[in-house]
């Protein structure tokens, strides 16, 4: 069903219903205007806006243009009936295009439902419409009636391309910011759109970016509609809350204050400029405003000015604000419902998300100040359709967004030139002491007698330099921790899957009816919306500099197109002082070839060679082994843009290696992270439960602190670093285009020197030449983008994250001392729990929380670069064993030869997991290239691998050290060996002096993190310092090795159990790496986190969790209990039973019994999963095995209370009961593989995570939404954390 009620024509006769003359608030003496009601609560006025604000009624250009990138004035636009008809049809077409998407249908329904709150009465027990939320509709008989509305679309005011969303009045009440909301009008035109450079954004397809692209006007309208949604629901951010920029330096953009409201509406990583502390402030503020509205509704006893009933209007606002209502009719704000509504309005509804649904190309940042404007006509279907926009299917415009390409689809786009009232806001950059005569640097109209070389630089081409005032920093504030301290749920990244979940649960019914409003005054008057005061900056400010800047280098590459000959030069100075010279950063050979005059007979060969050389020059890349996370360098970026502090040596690569990515930054960001605020722990005398809960809350709040600091750093990185990188990206595109233009001009000049007869013999096409040069530029931009992205991520990971981690580690150390003292002080209350809690505190606070960029941004370009950054660490390895293409191979650049014995076993599910037995034929031999055989007393090296060591079952294993990885020759080298409860690293020099570093673990423990479980081992060796062993990213032991002399290792690495007395012994190993450097702690943690494969769920041992495989269950809150079934059927239940009991052998092991209780089997929900592996967010069924028969885990969601008791039902009997489970991974440093199971109803609504609840001292399994609210509590404090335990030979227990 379409959104627009019917097809309207401007000349259709008025009927007083959906076509009428209307008067809007604050219109004064205006004549009524013809308007069209395209949908309930939404009108369109195809007129220029000369009446909403008396001060904006003049359509002529103002005497002083606005401080914006571009303005456009044309007083004749939208003055004829044909233009108005086209406007009306264009607007309605865009509404249909928006409504055709799931996201657009949700947004428009929210707008229609967003009736401004009736807070117009001075009596607090009375509801009354606010008059400025109404219009007066002229009836055919000349009378009028008043009608409430939500939105008006109206033509632009004087500046045709200033699209904006505003309120009609009563802004003195702050309606758009107090939860009430107010009627909105949007100044908009479907007849104009803006350009942007695309190839700056796409990294993989050189066919894209052949020129400038045009924004789909549906995206522009959607952006303004999102503003309208914010303002209708009263959650718009105060316009005075802005993102400020510095303005003092020559390179800094002036006069720009981007409102937080605009950043939030755009979404994407721009929204991350608003740091989490400020965002939390906004969320809490509006939560309280919604509570005020609920309170007002509860007080209301009457309604005036309408025939609608009080109860009807209360229901309208209940639907709008998603209020809860109890049996007495009292309204309240449910925090979960509020969070969902607020998230939808502010994070789901964004321009960035609409781009994904429209499947169009778009600017990647709100800070896109492109000055290109195009006239368009979207009404004809041959130009633009509801489903495709400009990129018409079944035409050449469908591929590569060609429909938006203003050069390919040039019939649809008329670029506006010679703007009336175009205002150029600029800075004047002057270099002292250069005497100028006739130079290109002095723009027309400037004094030619200046002794300084000066250039004009448009303000919007300068660096976006954010002020420190933008970043709130409350991280140093202390906090009191109690047993009921609120733990914030983790924010879920916005994905298409999440939006689809919102869509599936969105209520599209109950659209509010038109209600009768008593006639208001014929001229509705309210206070006009106040606009923020924007500080004005002087135009043309002059800066005297001592050296050329990036902008001088770019100006030196420009030239005036004319009939005179130009020539390339490698001298910036010459190019700036001589209008006929153009600076190039290409080689001197290229300069000689392009500047050389050519005879007609040689012309085509000359052109072909120049195109080839141009491609060769732009394709130039360098590589270095000295920077692990930057794999390619574009050496000409330095001389192209004057970047790098070693350029006087023409060595940009050297400068990068010497200084790192910081050389790209014009201003170095400062991140002021203070000493983090401490926790004050509240004591509870003689209350064990509350004391334990306080400790748990402190650990959970510690996790929040890490998250806050990471968010804060990412916000600073995006705003301060990535914006600079993006400007360099843009300027490099301009620089390459300048080179292409100069090359074309020289070739064209040469062609025009020939006689007509000579030209006739030359088959030359300037457009074909342009196409070839553009293709070379676009291919070059792929490498440039890759390099710049790597530099940006490198700066984040090497200069910013470590600084934050150091602050956090100091905080952890302080908290650890406080918690251990708290446990000691309350030891009398914590009887039986002291040791467990101390271990928990020590383990939690000894482990850093790995940084994952995907938690904080959803920009795929940056995320893929971050992933590549992790992989680059592996790429520094000189041996990297992986199973690929049915072979075990070395993925390092050395490709070592590998010999595999006949008794080596590869796991069928993950063939990287290799099983070695205690057999002569069970071995792997790696033959190293001579270049990487270790033979040194100074060079550092590291190794890493994952290992699973089965339990030691008998005394034969005591005091039996055996080697598993051996690189020794002539009693010199290194090896890895095992002993009962030990992993041992040995280094031995040629004089047989050795050093050992050992990790020890116990087999006398109930539930071990190490017995038969995958462990990540890293050993680093700094020859002038220590050898260190890390387990799961944590430093365990270190010993000095500076006393060792030369170590000459073998050229063979042997993986084999050597010297083991137990003939039944075996091990599992995977992901072996050898590095020719000392890995630092950050690299170890990054490598560990990446190889943990957190997107795949793991079982108790660390293997991949599988479908159709039986598992025993371990609840991490109460690990001494197991799951049992009371009875099958809807009246039966499952529960935790205990204790587990023990399995033991004297002096060898003493452990809890793991194979106890009911077995669970995970079944596929849909057939889309091609393998048998369970992944994060998989939707599954859970079967329960009772007496060798499978039953389905399910619940009746209509049960009273939050906790829904789970039952084991006959599978055919499940019917409409809730049975779908969403699997969630919770990877705790790769040791404990926690899983959470979120039960949903048949509509996809969350019932809650599966845990347990005490009913009459029986711990019954339930699905509870309480867990969903507390999900970020520390791992062992919630009953919804589970581990799946399969039977495994390495554990040695006989299943019951």
UniProtKB/Swiss-Prot annotation:
TM segment ranges: 627-647, 656-676
Keyword line: Disulfide bond, Host cell membrane, Host cytoplasm, Host cytoplasmic vesicle, Host membrane, Host synapse, Hydrolase, Membrane, Metal-binding, Metalloprotease, Neurotoxin, Pharmaceutical, Protease, Secreted, Toxin, Transmembrane, Transmembrane helix, Virulence, Zinc
Region of interest (Translocation domain (TD)), ranges: 449-872
PTM comment text: In a bacterial culture the precursor chain is initally cleaved on the amino side of Gly-445 and is processed more slowly between Lys-448 and Ala-449 to give the final mature heavy chain sequence.
Regulation: SNAP25 proteolysis is inhibited by 1,10-phenanthroline and 2,2'-dipyridyl but not EDTA. Inhibited by hydroxamate compounds with halogenated benzene-containing arms which directly bind the zinc ion.
List of catalytic residues: 224
Cofactor: how bound: Binds 1 zinc ion per subunit.
Entry binding sites for Zn(2+): 223, 227, 262
Signal peptide: none
Region Belt, annotated ranges: 492-545
Cofactor field: Zn(2+)
Effect of mutating residue 224 to K/Q: Light chain no longer cleaves SNAP25
GO BP field: proteolysis
Alphabetized GO MF terms: metalloendopeptidase activity; protein transmembrane transporter activity; toxin activity; zinc ion binding
Region annotation (N-terminus of receptor binding domain (N-RBD)) ranges: 873-1092
Database matches in CDD domains: Toxin_R_bind_C_BoNTA_like
Enzyme Commission code: 3.4.24.69
Subunit record text: Heterodimer; disulfide-linked heterodimer of a light chain (LC) and a heavy chain (HC). Interacts with host synaptic vesicle glycoproteins SV2A, SV2B and SV2C which serve as coreceptors. Glycosylation of 'Asn-559' in SV2C probably contributes a 12-fold increase in affinity to this interaction. Depolarization of target tissue with high levels of K(+) leads to greater levels of receptor exposure.
Stated name of the protein: Botulinum neurotoxin type A
Species annotation: Clostridium botulinum (strain Hall / ATCC 3502 / NCTC 13319 / Type A)
Gene: botA
